[in-house]
């Protein structure tokens, strides 16, 4: 009888040691850190540069201006009057040695 009780105790101990315990809970997930957004670059506010230089000239020489005509000088709205009397150049200033 003692052998049966000893066997029962041993059997209970072995079964207790082999019990299927529940697995430990998984660790909490790591907090998600999103990568920083790319730096903001405003779109350009001008037209892209042309691949070749832009030339704003006529392919031929402009005709001579007539006496008393008004000429548009440059792209700005400024007008130059063509004199009817030739302008004589001023003599050079005297050289100071």
UniProtKB/Swiss-Prot annotation:
Q: Using the UniProt annotation, give all residue ranges assigned to the region (Disordered).
A: 26-46
Is Oxidoreductase there in the keyword field? no
Tissue note: Expressed in the anterior region of the follicle cells.
**Where is the secretion signal located?**
1-19
Please classify the protein's predominant subcellular localization into one broad category.
secreted
Cellular localization per UniProt: Secreted
Q: Where is this region: Required for binding to the gut receptor?
A: 20-23
Q: Which UniProt keywords apply?
A: Hormone, Secreted, Signal
Where is it found, in Gene Ontology cellular component terms?
extracellular space
GO biological process terms held by the UniProt record = oocyte development
What would be an example GO MF term here?
hormone activity
All copies of the VM domain together span: 61-97
> What does the function comment of this entry state?
Has an oostatic activity. Inhibits trypsin biosynthesis in the midgut epithelial cells which indirectly reduces the vitellogenin concentration in the hemolymph resulting in inhibition of oocyte development.
What does the sequence similarity comment in the record state about its family? Belongs to the vitelline membrane protein family.
- The entry's protein name is Vitelline membrane protein 15a-2
